[in-house]
């Protein structure tokens, strides 16, 4: 912090105080902050560019930061091996196929998804995963597509596939000022599912806009009323652990770079095997088929994940996923979550205490004004 700037700001706003004094007050208010000190040591060893370039990085939703150790481990793997296209069967390709399958297992293990129950499908990003579900879901004129006001635009975009097939589209509103879902409205809408029809309910575990964390209990409630559930966890999993042995949506979408920064260009769809059988691809591509003929219209898709992975995977990047997952495990979700929520609580209180000279609040926060049922995103 520049002392001169601090002096100017303190005189003009009365808000910024001496850093050391404020930090001592902060630690007295949040003694548990010291239990996350491992992150400070990790910052020195694995994220040195932050200090070298005088950066403060607070994004736990749009893009995570990759660590130096992640890059080194991935580059060492590539530099010491020869990997070929996994769609072939030569020694280099078989070596890559083995790594791809190891990565799938690591992903399912990380999210505690039973491999007998779930498949792991790699895509280009979370939006690609959502599009895959939207274009393949068997909507009919008897179907409902139910979603919430605070979904990501890529979830909103599925309504275009829905509309083209004549299905009904309904939104669940959020209640101001906390922006939680209107539970009465949601319960009412969930009762509207036509038995035996294909009904899809999509909602975010954490709102990309407000940081609200919606109850994952809605997954089981919706399924008990005849809905398939699409859960967007892209904003949730960077700082919260998702356990698919406890919560069992049909489709789960995310991007890995939001979790640990690297690699970009790889997303994930985790789908129940039974739910995957329900999807019907509107086309086929290289890598997804076992047989296709130019003399007729017949073609046969691969079973399981391979039938949904168009073309050649970003295969050289895939081993970096297991490295990134191991990195998160080494830090610990508990530590990450604790650090983020302490900082979020502090910031919410500070923002709420800034007033105009007439006493009225300067800042309007959209979403929860406490850390109950919320993540680190603050909309104002």
Regions found by a protein language model. Give the residues of each.
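Pyridoxal 5′-phosphate
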Residues: 2-380
């Amino acid at each position: 912090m520049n002392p001169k700037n601090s002096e100017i700001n303190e005189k003009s706003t009365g808000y910024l105080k001496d850093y050391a004094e404020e930090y001592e007050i902060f630690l007295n208010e949040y003694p548990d902050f010291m239990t996350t000190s491992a992150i400070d040591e990790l910052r020195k060893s694995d994220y040195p560019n932050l200090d070298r370039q005088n950066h403060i990085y607070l994004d736990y939703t749009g893009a995570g930061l990759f660590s130096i150790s992640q890059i080194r481990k991935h580059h060492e793997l590539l530099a010491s091996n020869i990997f070929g296209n996994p769609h072939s069967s030569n020694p280099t390709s078989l070596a890559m196929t083995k790594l791809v399958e190891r990565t799938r297992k690591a992903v399912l293990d990380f999210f505690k998804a039973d491999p007998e129950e779930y498949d792991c499908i790699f895509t280009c990003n979370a939006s690609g995963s959502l599009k895959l579900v939207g274009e393949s879901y068997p909507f009919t004129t008897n179907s409902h597509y139910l979603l919430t006001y605070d979904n990501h635009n890529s979830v909103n975009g599925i309504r275009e596939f829905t509309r083209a097939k004549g299905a009904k589209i309904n939104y669940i509103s959020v209640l101001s000022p906390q922006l939680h879902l209107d539970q009465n409205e949601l319960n009412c809408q969930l009762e509207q599912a036509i038995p035996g029809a294909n009904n899809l309910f999509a909602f975010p575990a954490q709102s990309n806009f407000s940081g609200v964390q919606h109850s994952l209990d809605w997954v089981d409630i919706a399924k008990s009323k005849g809905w398939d559930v699409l859960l967007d966890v892209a904003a949730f999993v960077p700082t919260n652990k998702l356990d698919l042995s406890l919560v069992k949506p049909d489709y789960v979408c995310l991007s890995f770079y939001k979790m640990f920064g690297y690699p970009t260009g790889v997303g994930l769809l985790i789908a129940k095997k039974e739910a995957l059988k329900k999807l019907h691809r509107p086309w086929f591509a290289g890598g997804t088929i076992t047989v296709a003929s130019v003399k007729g219209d017949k073609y046969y898709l691969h079973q399981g994940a391979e039938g949904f992975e168009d073309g050649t995977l970003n295969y050289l990047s895939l081993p970096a996923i297991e490295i990134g997952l191991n990195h998160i495990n080494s830090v610990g979700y508990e530590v990450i979550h604790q650090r983020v929520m302490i900082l979020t609580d502090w910031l919410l209180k500070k923002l709420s205490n800034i007033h105009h000279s007439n006493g009225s609040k300067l800042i309007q926060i959209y979403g929860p004004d406490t850390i109950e049922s919320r993540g680190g995103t603050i909309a104002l």
